[in-house]
Amino acid sequence: MVARPADGSPALRIYVASNKKIKPPLEIGDCFLGRVKRVGGNLWAKPFARTSKAGGETEAEKIFGVVERRGNEYYLRPSQKNARLDYLLDDIGKCRDGDFVAAMLIGERKFKQARIFKNYGPFDLNKAVSCLVLDKYGIGCDFPETIGKETARCPKFSKKGRADLTSVPLVTIDGDDSKDFDDAVYAERTASGFNLIVAIADVAFYVRPGSALDREAYRRGNSVYLPNMVVPMLPEKLSNDLCSLKPKVERAAIACFMKIDRSGNLKSYEFKRAVIKSAARLTYREVQDAFDGRFNAQTSGLFTTVIQPLYEAYFALDKARKKRGALELDVPEVKIKIGKDGLIQSVSKAEHFASHSLVEEFMINANVAAARVLAAQNLPVMYRVHEKPLKEKLEEIEPLLRGLHLKLPEQPALKPAHFNRLLEVCAGKGWSAGIGNLILRLQAQARYSPEHLGHFGLGLADYAHFTSPIRRYPDLLIHRALIKAYNMPDGGGLEDNADRSLFEQIGEHISATERQAVCAERETDARFLSAYMQPALGSDFDVKISGLTSAGIFAAVESLGAEGLIPMRTLPDDDYQLRNCGFELFGTRSGRTFMFGDVIRARLTEASPVTGGLIFKYVDEHDGVDYFEKGSRGSFRIVPPGAAPEPEMGKASGRRKAKLKSGKSKK
């Protein structure tokens, strides 16, 4: 039997060794997990487990976890948060107690065991967490040997036919730790408004369609950013060097020239290949400091000619954004800083300055310009699509809106501004954060598609991603289309015979890799946060209620961006029911109410870096009673309709009692 790679990469002849433990035996068309090694002049694969049968039926489940010895037997403690069972290991081989491993589930449904196929060694936060998420989502770190050879042969760009922008003081504005600089900006005042330039690294010059670099970039789809490492879409020689818009170094770029009026409206635009020389590598913080009057040696000489015009143009663009009613949701990010020793140095909520919004608005308008140019040319385009919320989702929140005396219009007339109005009405109330969270959950997931459907959240009819080709494959596709649209020199454009029918498949693939990256980043953050919180076991925290379910209360430690669960069993003894679209957990006997956004006191009882889980127990501050130790248990039941009237949100009822008892009030 001969095997080929499942990801569709160039076929290799791999001979398959037999494994009598896999029953029924492997057949043609089956997919399996195995270890490949060279024997003589041939490649042989030793199968460990079948992953799917011919036709796509899933045969085995891949899991990760820690090996635990219990007496004479070894078990796998899964790393998944929702795992309810540990699995008996049929053979640990050379693994030891405490090793972090990957395994396949085998055996009957009711008596599943786990078989180890990869050992990462003793559990180590940096190594284990990274390996787990990367392997789980099929994200590869190392580039094939062919990529290194092709990168070494990358040609030097020619200045011929390119706009010379080396004398224009374009600057890059990025985070403190950024290493790949793919965008630079410039603004100058005019009689009617502003001239803007957004220069983006000319990745298409180096990554040609159909090349090994192109195939690998497509397979990855995007870069993945973990606290302790970056898995780049492109090799470091390109991402951090040849394509990176380093200061004082000539670099190839594709520049978007835009004219806006004083109200921030985009009046005209054009794209050209260019040569630029970044005047400075600035950070968001130092740009904001300069605008606020705190200069350093670098920004003092750039303020009048560069930084001040950028802000003036941004204020105009912000007017246009507000006028069109882009969705204004505050989604906080957590920043986890890892030291050179691999230990967590600090955890904090990421700061957001006006300088972040400045860069964002420049990029958004360049993206709009790219989408409009390509739509007019009728070229194959990979749009960034964000559709309106589904009608069914909107119907689910109607009872909540009635309680707030609000109403959203029917879907065809629905605009982001209607959600902004809802946020304004709820601002300052304890549950305002809950409304923001609810609005976020209502939104459709943004994706890549050749369909020209617009971007609901930004309030834009035309939108595509053009500004980050170093880390996003769809942006590279837009660059190639622009090169073709303008017949730019130096090649690398969309091929004449580009198959439009493939664009839907490409869009699905890069949307999937984006979702995988988000999941990998989220899971990694959770595990690092759990490790960071471990020394605080037994400590009490003021936590904000960020979710309510039949399982209990989700509680956020806002200063750290960490979230854990307060299980229902740790709540005061009562019968609880969810009300107002899950915004209230109401105790039917006591009248006690827990509401989304309330701040309560909770004690950290578990912090597991293996799963990324945090478990708290509820503590009543008012009377000093720890209900977990007291032995009281809360229970959840679904109350039949009509059994008890639901109070409107904001009415005193049990909510006021809960605040008095906990000693907390948002007002």
Residue spans of the language-model regions?
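Phosphate-interacting basic helix/loop segments used at nucleotide- and nucleic-acid interfaces
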Residues: L165-T172, D176-T190, L310-L327, E523-D542, ...
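Charge-lined substrate channels and their catalytic hotspots, especially those that engage the 3′ end
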Residues: M1-I200, A204-E250, R281, E286-D289, ...
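Structured C-terminal cores of nucleic-acid metabolism proteins
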Residues: S9-L12, L26, A369, E392, ...
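A short beta-strand motif that forms part of the nucleic acid-binding face
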Residues: P5-S9, S18, P78-N82, G107, ...
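Feature marking long nucleic-acid-engaging regions of large polymerase/nuclease enzymes
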Residues: Y87-L88, R109, D174, F181-K393, ...
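A residue-level signal for conserved active-site and pocket-lining positions in enzyme catalytic cores
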Residues: G29, G98, I116, I173, ...
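A short, charged
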Residues: G107-K110, A114-R115, K149-R153, G293-F315, ...
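Short coil/turn segments at secondary-structure boundaries
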Residues: C131, E145-K149, A163-T166, S268-K272, ...
